[in-house]
Amino acid sequence: MVQRSKKYREAAEKIDRNNLYTANEAIALLKSMPEYKFDQTVEAVLRLNVDPRKADQLVRGSVNLPNGTGKTAKVLVFARGPKATEALEAGADIVGDDDLVQKVADGFLDFDSVVATPDMMGKVGRLGRVLGPRGLMPNPKTGTVTMDVTKAIKDIKGGKVDFRVDKNGNLSFLIGKMSFTEQALDENFKAVADEVKRLKPSTVKGRYVTKATITSTMNPGVPVDPAVVA
């Protein structure tokens, strides 16, 4: 059995497990929990009533958070020639072509987001087993396979978050830092929740979101009424 810290137990005692909170109430409750010496990341997890094995139920997308993420993402760009130069000028942290593909294949993963020009995808596609499980594989649907590398980089650096349902139907996403105001975190949550709702597959019957939780790095999750999305 996992031994929880005193702070964690104190935080857990604040949560009424028989209650489903609004997103704003959950955020306020998280912010009332014991503090730590670092700025915790705040995340949300939604359980979707989808079958990710079916292509038409693989929910994925991206959103520019209205209040940013609270961190500056390290962006890796697969590009060559003028597009590589453009990526560097736009603020990309790591830029390269074939050699960089091999470096990532060999285990280099010190980055948060990946952008690729279409001509590089023949090589980048081989990294599916490395990037896919980490949610880092470039995709046209999220604007990360593009010739407009400047826009892609600016969006990511400005607070864009990508999301994708996992094989168990869970969809997790960052909504900010504990230092954010309650309103800022609530607005970020609603921005992603609204986009997830918009992406509801037409083939899904019944309730779309069956469970929702908002949590932070060191604290237990607070149950949120899934009706806020569904």
UniProtKB/Swiss-Prot annotation:
GN (gene name): rplA
Molecular function GO terms recorded: rRNA binding; structural constituent of ribosome; tRNA binding
GO CC terms, sorted: large ribosomal subunit
InterPro entries: Ribosom_uL1_bac-type (IPR005878), Ribosomal_uL1 (IPR002143), Ribosomal_uL1-like (IPR023674), Ribosomal_uL1/biogenesis (IPR028364), Ribosomal_uL1_3-a/b-sand (IPR016095), Ribosomal_uL1_CS (IPR023673)
Gene3D superfamilies: 3.30.190.20, 3.40.50.790
Coiled coil: none
Annotated function: Binds directly to 23S rRNA. The L1 stalk is quite mobile in the ribosome, and is involved in E site tRNA release.
Protein name: Large ribosomal subunit protein uL1
Statement: the UniProt record of this protein carries the keyword RNA-binding: yes
Complex formation: Part of the 50S ribosomal subunit.
